Amino acid sequence: MRYQFRKFFEMQNVKYDYSSVHIDVPNPLADKMIDWGKEKIKDSDIFVSQVDPSFGREDEMHVTVLYGIHSESPEEVTKIISGHKQISVKLGEIDVFTNPDKFDVVVVKVISDDLDELNNKLTSNVEFTSKYKEYKPHITLAYVKKGKGWKYHGLDQWKGKEFQTDYVVFSSKNGTKQKLAL
């Protein structure tokens, strides 16, 4: 909670190109993941950008349901998710998303039919832009320098952990965040 609280207030009023919907990883699991990343992922492996401070270590543990939403208002999303069942999540191994740019992304795989279903509902009903063809739910641990992520691939300390949530967070491109009940 300590990291999420700090990051939440630091990121208020930051403008983005798009809005998004995500679920929070609950505490104490979120704090344990942040602490693990600080202990196990070497500082020398971390990718940082002078232009975009969102890179580096992730300190707001979440699973994105959909990024790229054009609207800055949560109204449409609220209607779509209304009555959706509680979301159940199971964690998998650590994986690496490669990127043609200067970094790779160290992530924890997320297995959840509920998230897949909610992503499908949103992509079928809201205007959005995405450069990704396939939804791959995950929790980002850190952005690392190109080629440095593979040493963490397959680690399984989070594998099998589960959590549930009965809300999503609408993160508006205008910088505000709002919890939306399912």
Model regions and ranges:
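Histidine-dependent nucleotide/RNA phosphoesterase domain, centered on the 2H-phosphoesterase fold
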Residues: 8-182
